[in-house]
Amino acid sequence: MRIDINRIEKEEDIKLLKELKWNGFVFYQYDDEFSKDRYEEVKAIAESYKLKVYSGVKIKTESSKQLRDKVKKFRNKCHIILIEGGVLKINRAAVELHDVDILSTPELGRKDSGIDHVLARLASNHRVAIELNFKTLLNKDGYERARTLLFFRNNLKLAKKFDVPVVISTDAENKYQIKNPYDLRAFLNTLVEPLYAKKIMETAYKICDFRDYLMRDNVVRYGVEIIKEEKE
């Protein structure tokens, strides 16, 4: 399934996602604005267009302790937890936690990609995905865009070497930023081989499906479920 990660909430924009052949999306909010009611409103609209919607929260902080506290606070309130990266200690804290799903924009505001061999190993061990944020690339031009592409390539090389999950997102906030999933796939094909590009396109759904399973009422933890006995 093709699952995007974005902040789309208007009906006309959600309708466009359907027309562009997305199967669903993660609707994320920042931790300081998180509202379950807002997610439920988006979910109701999306389901009317037969789109699968998952709730997400993006945590933005420069404190490792605050990051851990917020992850603990939101883990059972939403499907996907993203951490806004850029600060090296935050990048590291994010990939050290099993409860974090995605490290977003690890290169943000940096002169390097934000990921090295050590962080790649940690991300692999804890199954924390690294995000390729397409909007950050489009919002740059000239040298800055070329440098961001270089960072993407570096992180993809490390991710493949250490078996780190990778996701790609449009991070769209309006209909003008929404992209066709086939365009994202074509973009990935310029960076990596086609089979790896296909794998990246499928990763967001796999993470969402795993978290959706863990949020079921009868699931204690992965592989442990409470089964109700049928009365004779």
Curated annotation (Swiss-Prot):
Localization per record: Cytoplasm
Gene3D superfamilies recorded: Metal-dependent hydrolases (3.20.20.140)
GO cellular component, as recorded: cytoplasm; ribonuclease P complex
Keywords: Cytoplasm, Endonuclease, Hydrolase, Nuclease, tRNA processing
Molecular function via GO: ribonuclease P activity
One Pfam family here: RNase_P_p30
InterPro entries (UniProt xref): Pol/histidinol_Pase-like, RNase_P_comp-3_arc, RNase_P_p30
Main enzyme class: hydrolase
Enzyme Commission number, as recorded: 3.1.26.5
Catalytic activity: Endonucleolytic cleavage of RNA, removing 5'-extranucleotides from tRNA precursor
GO biological process, one term: tRNA 5'-leader removal
Keyword tRNA processing listed: yes
Top-level division of the source organism's lineage: Archaea
Presence of the UniProt keyword Oxidoreductase in the record: no
Subunit structure: Consists of a catalytic RNA component and at least 4-5 protein subunits. Forms a subcomplex with Rnp2 which stimulates the catalytic RNA.
Reported function: Part of ribonuclease P, a protein complex that generates mature tRNA molecules by cleaving their 5'-ends.
Protein family (similarity comment): Belongs to the eukaryotic/archaeal RNase P protein component 3 family.
Protein name: Ribonuclease P protein component 3
Organism this protein belongs to: Methanocaldococcus jannaschii (strain ATCC 43067 / DSM 2661 / JAL-1 / JCM 10045 / NBRC 100440) (Methanococcus jannaschii)
